Regions:
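Conserved small/polar residues in nucleotide/adenosyl-binding loops
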Residues: 1-5
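Short helix/loop capping segments that flank catalytic or ligand/cofactor-binding pockets
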Residues: 8-12, 20, 44-45, 93-95
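Short, solvent-exposed amphipathic alpha-helical segments in soluble enzyme
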Residues: 14-20, 51, 159
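Short amphipathic alpha-helices and their capping/turn segments at secondary-structure boundaries
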Residues: 15, 22-27, 120-136
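Gly/Ser/Thr-rich active-site loops/lids in small-molecule metabolic enzymes
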Residues: 19-32, 161-165
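Active-site-proximal alpha/beta segments of enzymes that process anionic O-linked groups
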Residues: 27-29, 42-124
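A long, amphipathic alpha-helix that forms part
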Residues: 119-132, 147-165
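Structural motif
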Residues: 139-143
Length: 165
């Protein structure tokens, strides 16, 4: 069963959305009863088995309420994980919360660049920690994309190389 909402929503929209126009749907069944594991987003007219649980106070909000500065860093492949998902479904940063997103490389397969943007992320985190008097981060959230993205390639050697930053 697939429970991640970040990719399943596109497929669900292709089946449900009346104004879907990203590709031509042939033999489109008009009378579908669509059930999803989770609620993907407002406006998708599907039945939901497990409605979203509202996170009352995400960690980032709690840290912000304490008056602490924080940084969430990743590359674009995992941007939603250090912003939207970590913040309980909210993309807007809290006071004192900095999002630092590095563009992922445009390649056919990440096996060809197993380090992805990890060295840049590593170096930026080290730079900001060393400059604590400038940034004053009390919390840093880092998501290295390459273990996950390389795991999907099935290329074991590239996955190992990508994790040796």
């Amino acid at each position: 069963m697939y429970k991640r909402q970040d990719r399943a929503r596109e497929l669900t929209k292709a089946f449900i959305s009346k104004d879907f126009n990203h590709f031509v749907r042939r033999n489109y069944p008009e009378n579908l009863y669509v059930v999803t594991m989770t609620g993907y987003e407002e406006g998708i007219d599907a039945h939901v088995i497990f409605p979203p649980t509202k996170v009352k106070t995400p960690i980032a909000e709690y840290i912000s309420d304490l008056g602490f500065k924080q940084m969430h860093i990743s590359e674009t492949e995992k941007q939603m994980h250090v912003t939207y998902f970590f913040n309980g479904g909210v993309e807007k940063p809290h006071v004192g919360e900095d999002f630092f997103i590095i563009p992922s490389q445009k390649v056919e397969s990440y096996a060809s660049v197993p380090q992805m943007s990890s060295p840049i992320i590593r170096d930026e985190v080290v730079r900001r920690v060393k400059a604590y008097d400038v940034y004053n981060y009390k919390f840093i959230l880092i998501n290295f994309a390459n273990p996950d993205m390389l795991g999907h390639t099935g290329n074991y050697d590239a996955t190992v190389r990508g994790n040796e930053i």
